[in-house]
Amino acid sequence: MGIATTRTGDRVLAAVGAGGNAKPEFESHDGVCNGGVLFLLPALLSQGLLKTKELYQIPATHYYGLESVLLTLAFMALARIKNPEQLKQCKPGEIGRLIGLDRTPEVRCLREKIKLLSGQNHAQELNRKLVDHWYAPNETEDRTEELFLYIDGHVRVYFGELANLPAKFVSRQKLCLNATTEYWVNDLQGLPVLMVTGELTEKLQTAIEGQIIPQLQQTILLPTPSQEPVSNESKPAEPAQSIVPGTEQPTGAVAESKEPAALPPLCTLIFDREAYDIPFFERLWDKYRIAMLTYRKNVKDNWEVNCFENIEVTVLEQKITMNLCEKKVTLGGVPFREIRRLTESGHQTAIITNNQQITTEQAAGRMFGRWCQENFFRYMIADYDFDKMIEYGVQAIDEKKEVINPQYRKLNHQLKKQKEKTVRLEAKLLEIVETAMATPVDQLPKTRIKECDLIEKINASRSKHKELFNEREGVTRKITLKDMPGQQRYNQLKPESKMLMNIIKMICYRAETAIANLLSEYGVSEAEKRMVVKQIIDNNADILPDTENNTLTITLHSLSAPRFNKAAQKLAQLLTSTDTFFPNTKMKMIFKTTAL
């Protein structure tokens, strides 16, 4: 049965369906490896780890029940055990003690459990339940605060051969590679909210309208416009011209009722230039009453420097003085507020929004705070093996979906290269002609030969370009998937298992962030707080159960510095006051540290 297997009777009973899933049973142990991860259990539970029980099931014939599997996956993620294969390098009995069993699931067993859960296809519903849990209103929370969400796509490169994926541009490697795109929604603190997977080469605005907004509308975050009562107390922000002198007055087209100033937006989406499209912005407001905030594209003019003023802006909880100016503009017949930041180099960064409720400094702070989402991606890639494939296999995509014809794309690429070749030859010919003007008369015949040779090559290149152009004219630009040849037809990697693991990692990241924020209140610096959380997770701990009083005491060993130990002591006191019970038991958890 494997190393550290001691509960053989329970395993046999579970196998024959008589005993059910194994219940946690703790024994006294000193110096359990990674025992500090139990300090994050209250945060994991508060972030909704056991919400999974409302949707997923594991049959009673399995020794490892749902709680045990969830705790194993969560503790693995927090301990930076990045995939089941790495369990081979760990002590199975040590991790087993953390979940109250004799040992951790074996690699194949854990993969089977992940496959079993993924086959139930509840990942998106689980994500929505967690959103309702994370952002449920409470008595102390100000529900009048406007909702802002960051949205961005994360490209996950695929190096395998089983799936036939379309090529996407990967900015990290500056190459076009076979990949899938995950679209993430984060809140203003950078915490993950929602995630959807793109099937083909969808644009960001397509993912927002087709997947993200429908998912959000099924949560408490984004009610439909008809469900949202309009408050008479909501007032738009002060006019832009009162902030900065010299601003432009709105034109007649802007002053019409088309301007979204009368109603507060249900939500403001913040994204980069990838989703820049004026009709898309207009649809978001008209159809969903959603405002947008993004960078403006194709800015060709510069505003007068004397229009800018130094304004204190809060970016990610830090006060920064920015040189800002705001004007009202009309783009494509649609009114917007344009805010520009003047940098020390003289560059003007342009931001546009149709949210009339927020101030200039709020708009700038939220736009430039978008890097918290990029920091989230970078942290997850480095610490949680964000791009790791969970399950091998592919599945078909709706054959009615349209894609760019691969033959059209190939011809288009050849046309581009042929045109570049022609331009290079023409530039070379121009250089020879200019040189010939200063060449002695007796050397002109040699130059003439070179000119004739280049002219011949240019004519041949132009003829080839014309042939390719005519060939492309006979090819349909877009085709449906069913019209693609079988070997070239696009499919997709199975998304359910990756989505489920992403949700578990969301919970872990939010739990880790919650503990890190508590540590910062106890004297740990912002630069060190996540490092201290990792140190707590990696540290050993003593486990002492008390069956008479139904308590489970977790004693963390000393950390690397006295100030960290002081913070850990205060954290232990707070965690104990939460009255957390270990899942599937009646044992109240008590947290202590060995440091004096």
Please give the residue ranges for each predicted region.
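C-terminal, active-site-flanking charged/polar segments
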Residues: 291, 359, 367-403, 461-468, ...
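An anionic, glycine-rich sequence signature occurring as long contiguous blocks
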Residues: 225-256, 286-373, 381, 549, ...
